Design a protein with these regions (language model features):
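Serine-esterase "nucleophile elbow" of acetyl-processing enzymes
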Residues: 118-119, 125-211
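Structural motif
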Residues: 127, 216-218, 253
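Short, solvent-exposed loop/turn segments at secondary-structure boundaries
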Residues: 169-173, 194, 227-230, 265-268
């Protein structure tokens, strides 16, 4: 069985739109209005998008295509799970190569294909798309399948944030902090995070297509570099207003910026800890909102960053997620 457009749409989670263009399935996690507000190439990244279904087929054949969203990231992995166990990947970088500053190296892109043998009987398939670049599916075939049934979680987490929440610099989409948190809360992901972005009130003002059960907000490290403190506070307050208007009563976790090696420098927003203090001032003591100190979520060691500067590698995300989950499950 080769999955057709309607079948692929039915098994996709985390996407606002699925289209077949130029021989490829394109997945969008933003509405046209959201993409216009963000206005960044990373909106084409399918971060958090998954294809989840039950089937009785014996072999999964997957054909994919990848290209850079912008020049600085080209690593990727499609992670394939069978009954919640990693069965294989399509990736252009081995796990063993993920040492030092691997994030800024160029890796092969284009068309890739692979077959995955499946165990007998019914099984649940989960295909996680890359977060690091623009990725498409050209074809999915389930050999000897007599049916596919979409799988959806009862709960959903809506993520807002920058490149770290988008997933940089985990090679595997299943090992980002967003994926780890979603697994802990048994929820599907809607990821509205985009690298390089800051608190943007206009984005929060647009209600998500799916009403979430949880919300995660994680901005600040880019704001520190790009706006003054007064503007930062104004933007953060505007973002809060949008969240409270559209998602009143929804448990919301606001994460302050992670530790970074250059945190003692003075940037446009002043001292780095001005950001955390201001977020506590604006979001703290609000009903259904928990402010989480990002500075304490990871070891203060640049070796846990995939670029040795800012973006956690998979070890870094393990620390991040494990500590974050403790706050979210309180």
């Amino acid at each position: 069985m080769i999955l057709n457009t309607e079948q692929i749409k039915s098994v996709t989670t985390g996407a606002t739109k699925v289209e077949f263009k130029n021989g490829r399935y394109c997945f969008s996690r933003f509405s046209d209005a959201e993409a216009k507000i963000i206005n960044h190439p990373y909106v084409s990244s399918p971060a958090g998008i998954q294809l989840k279904f039950r089937t009785d087929g014996h072999i999964l054949k997957l054909k994919v295509y990848t290209e850079k969203s912008i020049e600085i990231r080209s690593y990727f992995s499609f992670d394939i799970f069978v009954d919640n166990v990693l069965a294989g990947t399509i990736q252009n970088l081995s796990d063993e190569e993920c040492i030092g500053d691997y994030a800024n190296t160029n890796y092969p892109l284009g068309s890739f294909s692979k077959e995955f043998e499946l165990k007998d009987g019914d099984k649940d398939i989960n295909i996680l798309l890359p977060h690091s670049l623009t990725a498409y599916i050209e074809e999915i075939e389930i050999v000897d399948s007599t049916y596919i049934i979409p799988i959806k979680k009862e709960k959903t987490i809506l993520f807002y944030g920058d490149s770290i929440t988008q997933g940089f610099d985990s090679l595997h989409p299943s090992k980002t902090y967003a994926s780890r948190l979603a697994k802990a809360l048994d929820a599907d992901i809607i990821n509205k995070a985009v690298g390089g972005t800051v608190f943007t009130p206009e984005l929060a003002a647009l209600p998500c297509e799916t009403k979430p059960n949880y919300i995660v907000v994680a901005y600040g490290t880019n704001d520190w570099n790009s706006v003054d403190l007064e503007t930062f506070k104004k933007n953060a307050k505007g973002f809060l207003e949008g969240i409270e208007k559209n998602y009143s009563g929804t448990p919301t976790f606001v994460i302050t910026p992670l530790w970074r090696p250059d945190w003692r420098e003075i940037k446009k927003c002043g001292e780095f800890l001005n950001i955390e203090n201001s977020i506590n001032e604006i979001f703290g003591n609000r009903e259904n909102i928990t402010v989480i100190p990002g500075f304490e979520l990871i070891p203060h060691d640049k070796s846990i960053f995939g670029d040795l500067i800012l973006h956690p590698n998979e070890k870094g995300f393990e620390h991040y997620a494990n500590n974050l989950i403790k706050y979210c499950l309180k």
